[in-house]
């Protein structure tokens, strides 16, 4: 990456969060109970041990986790909670397009990429955020890095197909370990 491109990545990944916070936080702390959710790619544990592509991209992926920790310190005195949440292997529109499938036939992509079997819909991470927002004791998660799969176990919600994909555990234990794709015990 060029310096110009790398700095642009960081501006989009970090500055936008800081600018949003500058204007949103006064509203958020007007009364206790606010929630800030930084969405990123990868848990703190995973990202601590895995370098991502180049220095700019790597920083962009870890920055929201650190922002959540920083926001937690700044917002806690106002009764607000800040966390970072990562979806698993997200079955987004771009991923479906990349594999030439739709949400209805997404499993066909597993012929090209067998580990895609652990993927989840965007609704799954949305349900994670909704469950967290509805939790009156959500401050127990203050400053933490969470995953949609981990929160599904905690709160009992499922993805659209009724499963609970635990993608980050799968990535570590199966995909990164070089094992054949098998989502048994991970969905």
Model-identified regions with their sequence ranges:
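Catalytic Tyr-X3-Lys loop
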Residues: 1-19, 37, 64
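Catalytic loop of short-chain dehydrogenase/reductase
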Residues: 3, 29, 34-77, 88-90, ...
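Conserved catalytic Lys-bearing alpha helix of Rossmann-like short-chain dehydrogenase/reductases
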Residues: 14-17, 59-68, 82, 125
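A short, exposed helix-loop element centered on a Lys and neighboring polar residues
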Residues: 21-22, 69
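Rossmann-like NAD(H)/NADP(H) cofactor-binding core
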Residues: 37, 78-83, 144
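Short aromatic-enriched loop/helix-cap "lid" or pocket-rim segments at secondary-structure transitions
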Residues: 50-51, 94-98, 155-160
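A glycine/serine/threonine-rich, flexible loop-to-helix segment
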Residues: 77, 89-115
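C-terminal helical subdomain
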Residues: 84, 105-187
